[in-house]
A protein has these predicted regions:
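Glycine-rich FAD pyrophosphate-binding loop
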Residues: 26-50
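An anion/pyrophosphate-binding glycine-rich loop and adjacent beta-alpha core
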Residues: 39-41, 46-47, 55-62, 95, ...
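Short hydrophobic core segments
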Residues: 10-12, 35, 134, 153-169, ...
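A conserved short coil-to-beta-strand element within the FAD-binding core of flavoproteins
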Residues: 130-143
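Glycine-rich active-site loop/strand segments that organize a redox cofactor
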Residues: 50-98
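N-terminal Rossmann-like FAD-binding beta1-loop-alpha1 element of flavoenzymes
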Residues: 7-34, 389-394
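A glycine-rich dinucleotide-binding beta-alpha-beta segment and adjacent secondary-structure elements
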Residues: 130, 294-371
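Core beta-strand elements of the Rossmann-like FAD/NAD(P) dinucleotide-binding domain
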Residues: 5-7, 148-157, 225-226
C-alpha cells in the first residue's frame, strides 16, 4: 500500500453534487480529492433527460421538495439558484432550451454538463480518483482516513455524496446510509420515488392498454399533478404518475381525472346536443379511442347517449373525474429515478450540510432526505447542496 496522501477535503461520489462540491471547494483554495467507484464521473447525469440532461427547472421552490424536515432545503436553494446554474452553463457556452413546465435541457448532450463540471474541478486543481471503491473509512485525531483501492487518503473534511440506491444498474448503492449510520446519523427509511406504480389483478382490464397515454390529473393525498399518464403492462407510469408516486404510500388510492378539460355536466349537455353519439365515442373525443372503450366498459355504459339516463351519465362523469386505482406497489429502485428518504436532514446544518454531531462530516445530494419533483428539481438540489458544502469547506460560507 502506498503512503498516505493528505488533503483538506475528501469527497465520496462523483455525481452532480460531488462534482459541484469539489469544484467550489477547490476553487476556494482547498486541496480536494474526489473518489468514485465508477470508471467515469456523472453517470446519472449522462442518462438523464434522454441523454440531454434536464439540468434545472425555472419553477424551483422549496415546496416542490419532499423531506421529513420540509424547511431544510430552503437555505441552499435560495443561496444557489437555478439562475446561478444557468449562468454557469452560459459561461461554458452550452446551448439549452426550455421544453415544458420550466424544464431546461441541453440542445446537445448531457456530456456537456459533465465536461463543464470536470472543467470546473480542473480549475480548482481537484484530484479525481475513478474506479476506486472505498474499502474503509476511519476517523481519529480530527481527520478522516479513507482507504480506496490500494491507497489511503486523509483530510479534516469528508463529504458523503454517493447518492441513493435508485437505478442500481448504474452502480448505485446504499453506501451513503451505511456510512452515515456508522457516524451516528439517523436515516429516514429510503424508498423509491419518481417511480412507476404497479396494479394488482383486479385491474387486469387496463393491461390491454399498455402503451396508451393521456393527459390527466393524478392525485394521492393532497398531491395533484396535471401531466401525461401512461398505461404499462405492469400498471401506471408517465410524468403524472411518477410525480404522485413520491407522495404515495402503500394502501393509499391514486385517483385520476381522465377528462380534466371537461366542465361539470358535459355528458348530459352532449346528450341534448348530439343524442345519437355513442358514449364511448364521446369519451374518445378527449382520450385515445382504446382507453375510451375500456373506460366505457368498466363503467357499464354503452350505446347512444339518447338511450342512457341522465343519472347514469352524471355518475359516469363523477367516476371519470376521480377514477380510483389501488396500486399494489411500485417497480422499485430499479425503475425509480430518485430515492426518497435518506440521511435525516435534522442531522445536518441547512447552511453548510455539515453533520451537527460530527464536525467535518458533510452529506449532500440524493443521499440526503430531500427529494424534488420530476423535471430538473433534483439536479438543482444537487447543485445547491454541493455549492453550500463546497463554500463551507472553502471557508466562504
Amino acid at each position: 500500500m502506498s503512503a498516505q496522501a493528505d488533503y483538506d477535503a475528501i469527497i465520496l461520489g462523483a455525481g452532480g453534487a460531488g462534482l459541484m462540491c469539489a469544484a467550489v471547494a477547490g476553487q476556494n483554495g482547498r486541496r480536494v480529492l474526489l473518489i468514485d467507484h465508477a470508471d467515469q464521473p456523472g453517470k446519472k447525469i449522462l442518462i438523464s433527460g434522454g441523454g440531454r440532461c434536464n439540468f434545472t427547472n425555472l419553477g424551483v421552490a422549496p415546496d416542490r421538495y419532499l423531506s421529513a424536515n420540509p424547511h431544510f432545503a430552503k437555505s441552499a436553494l435560495r443561496r444557489y439558484t437555478a439562475q446561478d446554474f444557468i449562468a454557469l452553463v452560459d459561461r461554458h457556452r452550452i446551448a439549452w432550451h426550455e421544453k415544458t413546465l420550466g424544464q431546461l435541457f441541453c440542445d446537445g448532450s448531457a456530456r456537456q454538463i459533465v465536461a463543464m463540471l470536470m472543467e470546473e474541478c480542473a480549475k480548482g486543481a481537484v484530484r479525481i480518483a475513478l474506479g476506486q471503491p472505498v474499502r474503509d473509512v476511519a476517523h481519529a485525531d480530527g481527520r478522516f482516513r479513507v482507504t480506496h483501492g490500494d491507497r489511503t487518503a486523509s483530510a479534516p473534511s469528508l463529504v458523503i455524496a454517493t447518492g441513493g440506491p435508485s437505478i442500481p444498474k448504474m452502480g448505485a448503492t446504499g453506501f451513503a446510509y451505511e456510512l452515515a449510520r456508522r457516524f451516528g446519523l439517523k436515516v429516514v427509511e429510503p424508498r423509491p420515488a419518481l417511480v412507476p406504480l404497479t396494479l394488482g389483478g383486479e385491474e387486469t382490464l387496463f393491461r390491454e392498454l399498455s402503451g396508451v397515454a393521456a393527459e390527466v390529473i393524478a392525485r394521492t393525498g393532497k398531491a395533484s399533478f396535471r401531466e401525461a399518464a401512461l398505461f404499462t403492462h405492469k400498471g401506471l407510469s408517465g410524468p403524472a404518475i411518477l410525480q404522485v408516486s413520491s407522495y404515495w404510500r402503500p394502501g393509499q388510492p391514486v385517483t385520476i381525472d381522465f377528462l380534466p378539460s371537461r366542465d361539470s355536466g358535459w355528458a348530459v349537455a352532449a346528450k341534448r346536443e348530439r343524442p345519437r353519439t355513442h358514449f364511448h365515442t364521446l369519451i374518445g373525443e378527449a382520450v385515445p379511442g382504446r382507453l375510451a372503450e375500456v373506460l366505457a366498459k368498466r363503467i357499464g355504459l354503452w350505446g347512444e347517449l339518447a338511450n342512457l339516463p341522465d343519472r347514469k351519465l352524471e355518475e359516469a362523469e363523477r367516476r371519470l373525474s376521480a377514477w380510483a386505482f389501488n396500486p399494489s406497489g411500485t417497480e422499485g429502485f430499479a425503475k425509480a429515478e430518485v430515492t426518497a428518504g435518506g440521511i435525516a436532514a435534522a442531522e445536518l446544518s441547512s447552511q453548510t450540510m455539515e453533520a451537527r454531531k460530527e464536525p467535518g462530516l458533510y452529506a449532500i445530494g440524493e443521499g440526503v432526505d430531500v427529494t424534488g419533483w420530476l423535471g430538473g428539481y433534483n439536479f438543482q438540489w444537487a447543485w445547491a447542496a454541493g455549492w453550500a458544502a463546497g463554500q463551507a469547506i472553502g471557508g466562504a460560507a
